[in-house]
């Protein structure tokens, strides 16, 4: 079974250490999201993002890494930049995550990015926070865009997440009717009220699989951020060892969905 982690901030550990950590838990490949982003401000105030770390990781370990591109929603050249995403080795998608400043999301300020993503076939990872109405409006308007809901759509108040396990999943399921929406099953153990292996969470995962189909769900660890709550191994093995999931479910959730949705073919 190929295991793909669809979000890691590998720049926080470095390339060699990231490879060692992946090997230790049994992860074959990972999608890098450089965080914090390396920004370059142009004279006109527009921000561009530097991918030197990810480019080096992909060049050195093309079978192990891909990465996420980011764009300034006000960049007048975003269409041209988006057109280059799929041409760059290892660059598979973009991400809308506003650093927990959701004003631009509420105001619909990502129209230019989403229009370009739809035009050029670039999947868009998006973290709704508590702005599900705004994200749903995007999903409806930009139906040619492949959206991926980050962090199972959980709210921003991490301390109260276990209180909202069922309601978080209920909210997530409202996206299932939109065929252009997939889900990143990341940070999910934070929702559990139980210790590893988080059986209450796995029961909720079964609901998500029934609603979306497992071919629209991909696992992510985000382990540099979730280390305050659970380990990298716990994030993975609560799924690998889950009796409620079939082997086919695990294959899709842990690898095949990421390959298919991100259009990231397995290297020969």
PLM features per residue range, with description:
Residues 91, 103-218, 266:
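Catalytic pocket-lining loop regions of alpha/beta-barrel enzymes
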Residues 1-6, 13-29, 206-207, 211-218, ...:
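Mid-to-C-terminal alpha-helical segments outside catalytic/metal-binding sites
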Residues 22, 58-62, 86, 139-140, ...:
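N-terminal cationic-hydrophobic initiation segments that often serve targeting/anchoring roles
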Residues 1-112, 116-120, 184, 240:
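Mid-domain alpha/beta scaffold segments of enzyme catalytic cores
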Residues 59, 84-86, 154, 201-210, ...:
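Short, electropositive alpha-helical surface patch
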Residues 11-13, 37-40, 73-77, 101-102, ...:
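Active-site environment of divalent metal-dependent phosphoester hydrolases
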Residues 8, 98, 152, 221-223:
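Active-site metal-binding loops of divalent metal-dependent hydrolases
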Residues 71, 187-188, 254-257:
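Acidic carboxylate-rich catalytic motifs and surrounding loops in phosphoryl-/glycosyl-chemistry enzymes
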């Amino acid at each position: 079974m190929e295991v793909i982690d669809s979000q890691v901030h590998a720049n926080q550990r470095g390339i060699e250490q990231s490879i060692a950590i992946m090997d230790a838990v049994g992860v074959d490949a990972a999608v890098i999201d450089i965080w914090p982003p390396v920004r370059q401000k142009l004279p006109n105030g527009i921000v561009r993002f530097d991918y030197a770390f990810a480019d080096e990781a992909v060049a050195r370990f093309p079978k192990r890494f891909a990465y996420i591109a980011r764009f300034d929603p006000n960049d007048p050249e975003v269409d041209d930049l988006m057109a280059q995403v799929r041409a760059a080795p290892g660059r598979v998608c973009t991400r809308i995550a506003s650093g927990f400043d959701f004003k631009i999301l509420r105001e619909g300020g990502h129209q230019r990015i989403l229009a370009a993503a739809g035009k050029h076939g670039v999947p868009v990872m998006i973290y709704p926070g508590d702005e599900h109405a705004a994200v749903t409006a995007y999903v409806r308007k930009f139906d040619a865009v492949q959206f991926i809901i980050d962090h199972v759509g959980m709210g921003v108040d991490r301390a109260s997440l276990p209180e909202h396990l069922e309601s978080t999943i209920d909210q997530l399921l409202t996206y299932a009717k939109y065929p252009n929406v997939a889900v990143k099953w990341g940070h999910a153990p934070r929702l559990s009220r139980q210790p590893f292996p988080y059986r209450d969470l796995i029961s909720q995962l079964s609901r998500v699989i029934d609603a979306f189909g497992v071919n629209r769900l991909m696992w992510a660890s985000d382990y540099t951020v979730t280390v305050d709550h659970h380990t990298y191994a716990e994030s993975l093995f609560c799924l690998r060892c889950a009796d409620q999931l079939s082997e086919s479910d695990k294959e899709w959730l842990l690898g095949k969905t990421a390959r298919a949705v991100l259009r990231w073919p397995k290297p020969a």
